[in-house]
Amino acid sequence: MNIFRFFEGRVEAALRSLEEEGVLPSGLDLTRVAVEPPRDPSHGDLSTNAAMVLAKPAGMKPRELAEQLAVKLGGEEAVTEVDVAGPGFINLRLNPAFWQARIPEILRSGPAYGASDVGAGEAVNVEYVSANPTGPMHVGHVRGAVFGDALCNLLEKVGYRVCREYYINDAGGQIEVLARSAFLRYREALGEDIGQIPEGLYPGGYLKPVGQALVAAHGRSLLEKDEPEALSIVREAAVEAMMELIRGDLGVLGIVHETFFSELALHRSGFVEQTLKVLEDKGLIYIGELEPPKGEVPDDWEARPQTLFRSTEFGDDTDRALKKSDGSWTYFAPDIAYHLDKYNRGYRTLIDVWGADHSGYIKRMRAAIAGVTDGNAEFDVKICQLVRLFRNGEPVKMSKRSGDFVTLREVVDEVGKDVVRFMMLTRKNDAPLDFDFAKVMEQSRDNPVFYVQYANARIHSVLRNVAEEGTYDLSDGALANADFTLLTDEAEMALVRLMAGFPRLVEQAALAHEPHRIAFYLDDLAAAFHGLWNKGKDDHSLRFIRADHRDVTLARLALIRSAAYVIAAGLAILGVEPTEEMR
């Protein structure tokens, strides 16, 4: 249960009661009424802004309305104290029994705790990774991949129907470079001495198997074909091989896309032209000449009449070109078509996960989607900043041009999938992230993935030891019937309150498209558990197992089993397996 939504309902009921009594006018808009944790925890457990946002439409002073509402809320069974603070905020303190009742609720839910139907089955398209199919995944791709996948998990947790999509950029200039690079490896596989890889081609050895496969499939016949025909065959084979490589790389991170959308297929279908016709019919395309941009002039800017999209009508800084001087499309045109295709497939919420180098593209894309869908699609771009790779504090140097880069598989092989996934979510996506191979494996408080997993392992160690003794029924049903009024220490109650806040945290993280909040929460939850563990070391009366007090033991076992479920629920969103035993 999201206790904050529950109390929003109680506040709303109190307001309706005041309406019936004639204190408030009927028909007030309650959409801005919220119940949240107070900024200062010493002020109470919950706080509502109801009086502040309703006073003006109600024709009352905020504090006057707050005092009347406080009387109503004070009659709630779970409320022990109501305080009107400042100009009219209302702070509530809840009785321990209300908090303690959350433990059996968590035990009944298990790892599904925190799930909700806020999304109501709405279809959401999340496009992430979409790396050019020109080689294996490298460490620069990892953050966006993990972020996008965790975001999908998060949205599904709160009831959205999510499509995990990968856009295959198989129609650009880099694919031409790939084809020529693979053709060179084909000649090498036939026994030719290709010497030094020419500047501008991909030098990585990962294309050697592509060359060998081409020889197995075609023998020497490609050498006898015209270059365009030969390169067309090589291009298709190379892209297919690279996508197979990429799927495998993503698989080691536990990432599986359900939809792969080809840019080349988009062009061949004629849908780019159809999309431009849609924009033309809406009066959003014209022939014009753009002013030169301020500062450094981009390579693709041309001082000539062009086919332009009226991007400024939707908040962009300038209108945008859709065709180049040679008659070919700019990158922008097929991107508009691709997003219209998503919209036509029934998605009204479109989320794109991009690298930091694409941040300047957001305004034009947002403008285009607003224009082509008549403003009926919600479009959100999540930018993932760079990952700086270190080893023992020293930066790891990489160059994709020279083929000297750390691959995704190398990172996962060294530290493990779960460490990689968790660490990629320990910073907000738009903040740079440092990843040190040594530090992420440290068993210390400074390593969040260890700290959270250690809390879970400690819990399972206690439960295993008790199970081996066979003196307690550790089924969830038996634990749910424990006497939770015996949990009176502030550290115990702090842990309960933190767990009770998890459903709200999940909902807010999902609506904000910010899965890193789950990682932050898990660190806080682990800290609360470890704090309780350490108190038990200093004060024997606070130990989880009390040989002299069976009922206290049962209540505490229920408490820590609940904590393990919440940890498991949070880790599942991150795509991380809970560790039950440290090795």
Curated annotation (Swiss-Prot):
Q: Which family does it belong to?
A: Belongs to the class-I aminoacyl-tRNA synthetase family.
Q: How does it assemble?
A: Monomer.
Record's protein name: Arginine--tRNA ligase
Q: Which HAMAP family match?
A: Arg_tRNA_synth (MF_00123)
Q: Which NCBIfam families match?
A: argS
Q: Which GO terms describe its cellular component?
A: cytoplasm
Per its record, the protein catalyses:
tRNA(Arg) + L-arginine + ATP = L-arginyl-tRNA(Arg) + AMP + diphosphate
Please give the Gene3D superfamilies that the UniProt record associates with this protein.
Arginyl tRNA synthetase N-terminal domain, HUPs, Isoleucyl-tRNA Synthetase, Domain 1
User: What SUPFAM superfamilies does this protein's entry cite?
Assistant: Anticodon-binding domain of a subclass of class I aminoacyl-tRNA synthetases, Arginyl-tRNA synthetase (ArgRS), N-terminal 'additional' domain, Nucleotidylyl transferase
Q: Which CDD domains match?
A: ArgRS_core
Species annotation:
Parvibaculum lavamentivorans (strain DS-1 / DSM 13023 / NCIMB 13966)
